[in-house]
C-alpha cells in the first residue's frame, strides 16, 4: 500500500515500527499491538479473535465441569469439549467477554458464556426437560433499605448462563437433545463430532433429522480438534 501499511486480514501492520496500529481484537497477552504474543514461530493468529492458547486454557480450567456434565447427560466429553472449543475459537471475540451479559440483562437474545448459548436456546433446553425451568423468582438482589427484589426471567437466565458450570450443563443438554431427536433416523449420531457440533452451531430451529447430514465449517473444526481437546481434558 502507498501508506506503507500492510493489511493482515483484521489489522494494519506498520513495518517501520514493527507493530500493528490497532489493538488485537482478542486482547490476548500483555501487548495488544503485536502478533500472536510476539512469538510467530510458536503461535499463529488466523482470525484475530480468541487465541489457541486462551481457548486451550478455558478447556483445561473447565475440564472437571465438562467431564461431569458429559457423564450426567450421556454425551461424549470429547464432543462436548470440541463444541465448546469451536465456539471459543471461531465465534468469540474480546467484546463478548464484556458486553454479552450486559445486553442479555437488558433483553437482547445474545449468546452467553463458555458454550455461547443464546438465552432463547437455554429456555428451549429447559422446555424440553433437559434443565430445570427457571423463573423470575429464582433470582434477585438484596438492595439496602428496600430488601430482596426479584428481577425478570430473562435476567435470571442470563445470570445462570454466566456460570460456567451451569452453562456447560446447558451445552451438554443441548447435545443430548440432538442425540435424542436424531437417533432414530441417524443411529450413529452420538459418536459424530462434526454432525453434533454442526447441529449445535445451527440450532434446533434450522435443522431437522435426516439420514444423510453434512457438517459445516464449525463442525469440521470441532472434529479436527477432537483429539486435542481430549488431551486437554486429561482423557488421552
Residues covered by each model-derived region:
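Catalytic glycan-binding domains that act on GlcNAc-containing polysaccharides
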Residues: 51-236
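Short turn/helix-capping motifs enriched in Asx and small/polar residues
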Residues: 1-52
Amino acid at each position: 500500500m502507498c501508506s506503507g501499511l500492510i493489511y493482515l486480514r483484521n489489522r494494519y501492520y506498520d513495518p517501520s515500527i514493527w507493530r500493528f496500529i490497532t489493538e488485537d481484537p482478542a486482547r490476548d497477552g500483555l501487548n495488544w499491538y503485536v502478533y500472536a504474543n510476539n512469538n510467530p514461530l510458536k503461535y499463529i493468529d488466523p482470525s484475530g479473535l480468541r487465541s489457541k492458547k486462551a481457548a486451550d486454557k478455558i478447556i483445561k480450567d473447565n475440564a472437571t465441569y465438562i467431564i461431569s456434565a458429559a457423564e450426567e447427560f450421556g454425551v461424549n466429553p470429547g464432543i462436548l469439549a470440541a463444541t465448546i472449543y469451536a465456539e471459543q475459537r471461531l465465534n468469540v471475540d474480546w467484546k463478548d467477554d464484556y458486553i454479552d451479559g450486559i445486553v442479555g440483562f437488558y433483553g437482547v437474545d445474545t449468546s452467553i458464556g463458555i458454550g455461547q448459548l443464546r438465552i432463547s436456546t437455554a429456555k428451549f433446553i429447559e422446555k424440553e426437560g433437559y434443565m430445570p425451568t427457571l423463573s423470575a423468582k429464582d433470582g434477585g438482589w438484596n438492595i439496602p433499605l428496600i430488601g430482596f427484589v426479584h428481577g425478570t426471567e430473562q435476567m435470571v437466565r442470563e445470570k445462570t448462563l454466566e456460570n460456567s458450570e451451569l452453562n456447560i450443563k446447558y451445552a451438554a443438554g443441548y447435545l443430548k437433545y440432538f442425540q435424542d431427536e436424531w437417533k432414530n433416523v441417524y443411529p450413529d449420531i452420538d459418536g459424530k463430532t462434526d454432525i453434533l457440533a454442526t447441529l449445535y452451531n445451527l440450532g434446533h430451529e434450522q435443522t431437522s433429522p435426516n439420514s444423510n447430514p453434512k457438517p459445516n465449517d464449525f463442525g469440521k473444526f470441532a472434529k479436527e480438534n477432537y483429539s486435542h481437546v481430549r488431551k486437554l481434558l486429561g482423557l488421552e
